[in-house]
Amino acid sequence: MKFLDSCILIDYINGRLPIDEDKSNLYINSIVENELIIGARDKKDLATINKKISLFPLLDIDQDIMDLSTKLLNRYKLSHNMSIYDAIIASSCMIYDLPLWTYNKKDFKFLDIGLV
């Protein structure tokens, strides 16, 4: 089981990264979903994005995740330039106890989460 960062899904959607694993064990949240949707260039692109990301279970972003993301931002925004998106993704990984599959390891290496 893993949490997928948007950078991994961008390569998957564009055909640069096959994902052969059981997609029911690869999770996203609405932050990742929105990061992908905002990158759509036209209606066809948007339809492709929505079709491909619908294969992955969507984890809820609850108050515990938002509270933890606020703590992470207070601690790491100035020292590591943490974004709100990365804070919510990291908090989701921590709360759901999932490693993060990302190319952007530098954005998360200072946190107590597994990186793939």
For the regions a protein language model found, what residue spans apply to each?
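Short, well-structured N-terminal submotif of metal-dependent ribonuclease cores
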Residues: M1-V32, I37-K51
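Short loop->beta-strand "edge-of-pocket" segments that line small-molecule binding or catalytic clefts
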Residues: K2, N25-Y27, L55-D60, P99
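Active-site neighborhoods of divalent-metal-dependent phosphate/nucleic-acid chemistry enzymes
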Residues: I13, L58-K106
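Conserved short-loop catalytic and cofactor-binding motifs
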Residues: I37, I53, P57, K77
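Ligand-binding grooves and catalytic loops that recognize ribose/phosphate and carbohydrate rings
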Residues: D42-F56, D64, S69
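Ligand-binding "clamshell"
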Residues: I113-L115
